[in-house]
């Protein structure tokens, strides 16, 4: 990897320049992405439709919802609402060949933000080997509890969305969940790259 510095001196020929210096660039997710996703997916309605199902059936239904949400997120994030962050992540990937965690993390963040803009969540670790996401206030878990669905069938939703994002980025991943709501006051997901992946 080359840098723009050598022995404390600037090497101008190695510095990356902006395409159009002085032009304002959009780095934040567009509100339209959130509006389109929340318009298409109604968490409350989904929870009510699962009311008479057992945990296994609810898990399968939520897996499908997670896949569909991530597919829509990827479509919107890569086309209609492609922002500067997305452009730069792809540019760096093409230059370095390093996909994980940036590409997968972007899709995960946008899907959480898109469907659940008021949830409390945080990426606590993002290295080339592991991505750790903590969700401490989850509107999906809350909606399921409100209609009397017990257990954690929403785990299927999260796992399926991560796997769909990994399919898009080409990352072979393992997913662990060492902490869960309500016991640990959060769900914590550990997404790691498989050896050789």
Question: What residue ranges belong to the model's regions?
Answer:
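ATP phosphate-binding glycine-rich loop and adjacent ATP-lid/helix-beta elements
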Residues: 156-162
């Amino acid at each position: 990897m080359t840098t723009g510095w050598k022995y404390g001196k600037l090497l101008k020929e190695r510095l990356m320049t902006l395409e159009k210096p002085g032009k304002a660039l959009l780095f934040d997710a567009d509100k339209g992405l959130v509006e389109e996703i929340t318009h298409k997916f109604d968490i409350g309605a989904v929870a009510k439709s699962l009311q008479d199902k057992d945990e296994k059936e609810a898990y399968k239904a939520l897996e499908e919802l997670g896949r569909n949400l991530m597919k829509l997120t990827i479509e919107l994030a890569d086309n209609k609402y492609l922002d500067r962050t997305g452009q730069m992540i792809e540019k760096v990937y093409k230059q370095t060949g390093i996909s994980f965690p940036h590409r997968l993390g972007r899709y995960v963040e946008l899907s959480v933000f898109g469907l659940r803009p008021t949830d409390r969540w945080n990426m606590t670790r993002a290295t080339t080997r592991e991505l750790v996401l903590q969700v401490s206030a989850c509107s999906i878990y809350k909606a399921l509890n409100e209609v009397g669905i017990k257990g954690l069938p929403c785990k299927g939703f999260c796992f399926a969305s991560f796997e769909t994002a990994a399919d898009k980025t080409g990352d072979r991943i393992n997913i662990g969940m060492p902490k869960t709501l309500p016991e640990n006051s959060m769900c914590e997901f550990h997404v790691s790259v498989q050896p050789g992946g």
